[in-house]
Amino acid sequence: MALIRDRKSHHSEMSKCHNYDLKPAKWDTSQEQQKQRLALTTSQPGENGIIRGRYPIEKLKISPMFVVRVLAIALAIRFTLNTLMWLAIFKETFQPVLCNKEVPVSSREGYCGPCPNNWICHRNNCYQFFNEEKTWNQSQASCLSQNSSLLKIYSKEEQDFLKLVKSYHWMGLVQIPANGSWQWEDGSSLSYNQLTLVEIPKGSCAVYGSSFKAYTEDCANLNTYICMKRAV
């Protein structure tokens, strides 16, 4: 009987236990997650600039187009600076003064002008560079229509700015068929201390190149030309 009572008592105790609402304990993980995130944001970058942790941060990627644009801007700035530098050198060397005003005779040493509008005045001579291409005869006629003649070299010292000319232009120098000598438009003979003449076959007219060098050429060829006249 005692054994039966003990079993009933044990069964009663077990029933009471089953009647309890036994649920698994819940842990408040919000604070733990905040600590982990804070640790990630304050961690020092490791190798390759990556922060190691539960939430890895990707590497910073630079677009190729961004690099191309930066290089293009840098080249544009460099080109602009070079252009400004050469313009300053050109201005200082050529001194392209457009002479439209009379100056006192007493300042004859620095006198220049007057010249027609848009002509270059240098050492009391007026020059105009024409970009249209013509034959030698057409170029001569164009200069005559403007009361001028094709370029003549008479002094390296006074025409020093012409040494910077790079392209080829008709000048007022032609070969006389009778004796093969070279003369200027005004009939004066070429002096070889004025410029160096490089002769080629079948060339009876001359173009001015640079550094006081002239090259013979067929008069029927098309070239740009330079007109010149004395300033009044």
From Swiss-Prot:
Q: What induces it?
A: Up-regulated in activated CD8(+) T-cells. Up-regulated upon lipopolysaccharide (LPS) and interferon treatments in macrophages. Up-regulated in CD8(+) T-cell infiltring pancreatic islets of prediabetic nonobese diabetic (NOD) mice (at protein level). Isoform 1 and isoform 2 are up-regulated upon T-cell receptor (TCR) stimulation in CD8(+) T-cells. Isoform 1 is modestly up-regulated upon lipopolysaccharide (LPS) in macrophages. Isoform 2 is up-regulated upon lipopolysaccharide (LPS) in macrophages. Isoform 2 is up-regulated upon poly(I:C) and interleukin IL2 in natural killer (NK) cells.
**Cytoplasmic side: which ranges?**
1-66
Coiled-coil stretches are none
GO MF, one annotated term: kinase binding
Q: Which GO terms describe its biological process?
A: adaptive immune response; cell differentiation; cellular response to lipopolysaccharide; defense response to Gram-positive bacterium; natural killer cell activation; natural killer cell mediated cytotoxicity; negative regulation of natural killer cell chemotaxis; nitric oxide biosynthetic process
Phylogenetic classification of the source organism: Eukaryota, Metazoa, Chordata, Craniata, Vertebrata
Role this protein plays: Functions as an activating and costimulatory receptor involved in immunosurveillance upon binding to various cellular stress-inducible ligands displayed at the surface of autologous tumor cells and virus-infected cells. Provides both stimulatory and costimulatory innate immune responses on activated killer (NK) cells, leading to cytotoxic activity. Acts as a costimulatory receptor for T-cell receptor (TCR) in CD8(+) T-cell-mediated adaptive immune responses by amplifying T-cell activation. Stimulates perforin-mediated elimination of ligand-expressing tumor cells.
The transmembrane segments are 67-89
Question: Which UniProt keywords are given for this protein, alphabetically ordered?
Answer: Adaptive immunity, Cell membrane, Differentiation, Disulfide bond, Glycoprotein, Immunity, Innate immunity, Lectin, Membrane, Receptor, Signal-anchor, Transmembrane, Transmembrane helix
Q: In which tissues is it expressed?
A: Expressed in natural killer (NK) cells, activated CD8(+) alpha-beta and gamma-delta T-cells and natural killer T (NKT) cells (at protein level). May be expressed on dendritic cell (DC). Isoform 1 is strongly expressed in natural killer (NK) cells. Isoform 2 is weakly expressed in natural killer (NK) cells. Isoform 1 and isoform 2 are expressed in stimulated, but not in unstimulated, CD8(+) T-cells and macrophages.
Positions annotated as glycosylated: N137, N147, N179
Q: Which residues lie on this side of the membrane: Extracellular?
A: 90-232
Could you say which disease the record links this protein to? Involved in autoreactive CD8(+) T-cell-mediated development of autoimmune diabetes.
Q: What else is known?
A: Is not capable of signal transduction by itself; isoform 1 operates either through the signaling adapter protein HCST and isoform 2 through both HCST and TYROBP signaling adapter proteins. Some families of ligands for mouse and human KLRK1 receptors have been characterized being very similar in structure and highly likely to be orthologs. In humans, an additional distinct subfamily of ligands (MICA and MICB) differs structurally, having an extra MHC alpha 3-like domain.
Q: List the disulfide bonds.
A: C112-C121, C115-C126, C143-C227, C205-C219
Report, from the record, the phenotype seen after gene disruption: Mice display no visible phenotype. According to PubMed:18394936, show normal development of NK cells, B and T cells but display enhanced formation of aggressive tumors. According to PubMed:19631564, exhibit developmental perturbation in size of NK cell subpopulations, increased proliferation, faster maturation and increased sensitivity to apoptosis of immature NK cells, and lower cytolytic response to KLRK1-sensitive tumor targets.
According to UniProt, the name of this protein is NKG2-D type II integral membrane protein
Q: Which SMART domains match?
A: CLECT
Task: Output the PANTHER family linked to this UniProt entry.
Answer: NKG2-D TYPE II INTEGRAL MEMBRANE PROTEIN
The cross-references to Pfam families, in alphabetical order and at most eight, read: Lectin_C
Sorted alphabetically, the Gene Ontology cellular component annotations on this record are:
cell surface; external side of plasma membrane; plasma membrane
Major site of localization recorded for this protein: membrane
Record bears the keyword Cell membrane: yes
